[in-house]
Swiss-Prot record:
It holds the Pfam family 7tm_7. It is a multi-pass membrane protein. One of its GO terms (molecular function) is taste receptor activity. Disulfide bonds: none annotated. This is Putative gustatory receptor 58b. The gene is Gr58b. Glycans are attached at residues 277, 404.
């Protein structure tokens, strides 16, 4: 059972991934029959994926125009270094993304098959236990969250496009080609973040469905309740393993996403500083779209962090929902045994998301993430202060030298 709104918005995410070759193979989606299955693995799509990856990597060459000679970065070494660091990180992101898809292609296809089998198996259990209205309400709320994320991504892309166009000093074929290459990479990064967010939405959906199933067991008869609880426990364990498998398989690719998001936020805020001190000339439209870019970028980042934390929290907080069943006055021996098994399973299996197995991402880490962005921007501002003081000190030194010569 899938709400039509959630189905349509997930189709949007899927087709974005297909266009930028972020899938190892295509899916066959029949909306009329609500059927979802793997297509026959196509060599054509594999070749298409290869050419898209090569195209994006070669595009990096055209992203270095003569902007260093006659653009707004000409007299700012910090902006130039930021540009080259972003270029290097984009190269790493492209290599890690498509390298993961090519090197782990067969494993990813097996993951697709496993996910579809999982969805069909526990879909019947969900329909049998969970109230239909509660399930549809949950799916509709997740669809709204996904739609909001898509709007944020495209709003940030629009603001960035307008600002990038305004920053062009002259319009010639070489600079326009570099501009188009940057837009292509912006769209690719947009699709990667959209796909990652879509996977998190689906995982969050499954863990929240488990919560609904546990709550629904209160009204069931005692003789059937223990069997339903066993099915819910199996569903939770399979969902947990599926989440771990997804996180491990795309660990490096997701790590490059977070690193690029980090550097993008620093770059945006540092450009905002340059706008505020008039180092970069702008008009009212530039200020408007610049402020919009800051708002949409940070809003989108916080939305991604919040969804990731929601997946981890909804998985690890299942025990709190299970305590409600333990507090029931009449619990049979079979029911008590299933409760004990499920409780032990929850204690031994907790979901944690770590970047490359090192940095754990949770709410405190998100606050540290934002704080480190601001601290790095402040450090970059110190270079501006030194550059502004340097000409003054040189002029004072020359004046002092001329006075000494006149005295002699």
């Amino acid at each position: 059972m899938l709400h039509p709104k959630l189905g349509r918005v997930m189709n949007v995410v899927y087709y974005h991934s297909v266009v930028f070759a972020l899938m190892s193979t295509t899916l066959r989606i029949r909306s009329c029959r609500k059927c979802l299955r793997l297509e026959k693995v196509s060599r054509t799509y594999t070749i298409y994926s290869f050419f898209v990856g090569i195209f994006l990597f070669l595009n990096l060459y055209f992203m270095v125009p003569r902007i260093m000679e006659d653009g707004y970065m000409k007299y700012n070494i910090v902006l130039q270094w930021n540009f080259f660091v972003m270029l290097f990180l984009r190269a790493i992101a492209v290599v890690s993304c498509y390298g993961t898809l090519w090197l782990k292609r067969h494993k990813i296809i097996q993951l697709y098959k496993y996910s579809l089998i999982y969805w069909k198996r526990f879909g019947h259990i969900t329909r049998a236990i969970v109230d239909k209205k509660e399930l549809l309400d949950l799916q509709e709320s997740l669809a709204r969250i996904m739609i909001r994320k898509i709007i944020l991504l495209y709003s940030a892309f629009l603001c960035s496009t307008v600002l990038q166009y305004q920053l062009l000093s002259v319009i010639n074929p070489q600079i326009f080609l570099a501009f188009c290459a940057r837009l292509t990479h912006f769209l690719h990064f947009l699709c990667v973040k959209m796909g990652f967010f879509g996977v998190l939405v689906l995982l969050n959906h499954q863990f929240l469905v488990i919560h609904l199933a546990i709550n629904a067991l209160h009204g069931r008869k005692a003789r059937k309740k223990w069997k339903a609880l066993r099915s819910v426990a199996a569903m939770h364990l399979k969902t947990l393993r599926l989440a771990r498998r997804i996180f491990d398989m795309f660990d490096i690719a997701n790590a490059t996403v977070f690193i690029n998001m980090f550097m993008t936020a620093i770059n945006i805020l540092y450009h905002a500083v340059q706008y505020s001190n008039s180092s970069i000339k702008s008009n009212g439209w530039g200020i408007l779209f610049g402020n919009g870019l800051i708002v949409f970028n940070f809003w989108g980042t916080m939305a991604l962090m919040e969804m990731l934390d929601s997946v981890v929290t909804s998985c690890n907080n299942t025990g709190q929902q299970l305590r409600q069943l333990s507090d029931l006055p009449k619990v049979g021996p079979k029911m008590q045994r299933e409760l004990d098994v499920f409780t032990m399973q929850l204690r031994q299996n907790r979901l944690v998301y770590k970047i490359c197995g090192i940095v754990e991402l949770d709410k405190p880490a998100c606050l540290s993430y934002i704080g480190s962005i601001l601290s790095n921007v402040i450090i970059l501002m110190q270079f501006d202060l030194r550059r502004q003081r340097q000409p003054i000190n040189d002029r004072q030194y020359l004046i002092h030298l001329m006075k000494n010569k006149t005295k002699v």
